[in-house]
Amino acid sequence: MASFPELSERAQQLLKALVERYIGEGQPVGSRVLARDAGLSPATIRNVMADLEELGLITSPHTSAGRLPTVSGYRLFVDSLLTVKPLHQAIVDQLWLDLESRENPRDLLETASKLLSELTHMACIISMPRRETLVFQHIEFLPLSDNRVLAILVTSDQEIHNKIIHTPHKFSAAELQTAANFFNAVCGGKDMVSAREHLRAELAKERDRLSEQLLQAGEIAEQALAEGGRSRKPFLVRGETNLMDFVELADVDRLRGLFEAFRQKESIVGLLDRCLESPGVKIIIGEESGFRPLEPCSLVTASYSVDNRVMGVLGVIGPTRMKYERVIPLVDVTAKLVGAALNQRTLAPT
């Protein structure tokens, strides 16, 4: 963030008033309006606004004599001038009731994204739990007909991954149970990537003393681990159509670019990964995203964690003139509640 040590208290207060009025009304703010609100002369206001414009904190659109904040102006406002109040406890309690009642992690995240988009009237984006952070819990095998085995893999988010695997010969239920016991002992408590690598190394090391059936079952387990560690759709987006309600985003070409951005997984995933790098709420404003379709937008995110391990990130996408004082606590609290609800499931007895 740029530093503005030379900014007087009066200039800061006028910038704050200008940003708040622009966020509320969506129209460039004139000096007469600010003068009336601040009880100062229009000439004094114009002088201060000239200084703010010279510093790149506000700008004047061609069609108006009023001013509106730049990305730098929003950044100074969000980082230094904004007062964020806690959410009403009734909202927090209702969010928890809605999230805690979900039966599985996917439903929980779906519900969180829906609630957040409804509460903010903007688009909500949630990255799914990162597969490499998930922990292997256990694996089971069931013999099927025609030399097929059903591998059932359970991970720490309580997701169940099923894969039918064709085998070179028919396994008995007892052989498969022995194999499952061995693999659970070898892989238990390890993340998905480490579990697969450790299993492969253990099978290679013990190859001479393990039965051919167990070695073949090891190949089945490796396939199941690979399937369980493979990413599904990396994120959820809900409430995209809410963005059509904002005048500055309602241009057809701009909306097309935004909706296309939601389909370009690589760019969005890269942006969400950036948001995972620091704890707490992270705010990306306009061109700070480095992603052209999102330049007219701000992204407010917070990571959610399970057992002190960051699993993903959730956030709100809306116009740069969003009501940050409301969006920030909603995102922050929702992320904490999602983590708490997921943690409750992870720690629950199976």
UniProtKB/Swiss-Prot annotation:
Stored Pfam families: HrcA, HrcA_DNA-bdg
Claim: Isomerase is one of the keywords in the record: no
Protein's job: Negative regulator of class I heat shock genes (grpE-dnaK-dnaJ and groELS operons). Prevents heat-shock induction of these operons.
Protein name: Heat-inducible transcription repressor HrcA
GO biological process, one term: negative regulation of DNA-templated transcription
Annotated source species: Methylococcus capsulatus (strain ATCC 33009 / NCIMB 11132 / Bath)
Gene Ontology molecular function: DNA binding
SUPFAM superfamilies referenced in this protein's UniProt entry, alphabetically: GAF domain-like, Winged helix' DNA-binding domain
Similarity remark: Belongs to the HrcA family.
Family annotation (InterPro entries): GAF-like_dom_sf, HrcA, HrcA_C, WH-like_DNA-bd_sf, WH_DNA-bd_sf, WHTH_HrcA_DNA-bd, WHTH_transcript_rep_HrcA_IDD
PANTHER family: HEAT-INDUCIBLE TRANSCRIPTION REPRESSOR HRCA (PTHR34824:SF1)
Keywords (A to Z) from UniProt: Repressor, Stress response, Transcription, Transcription regulation
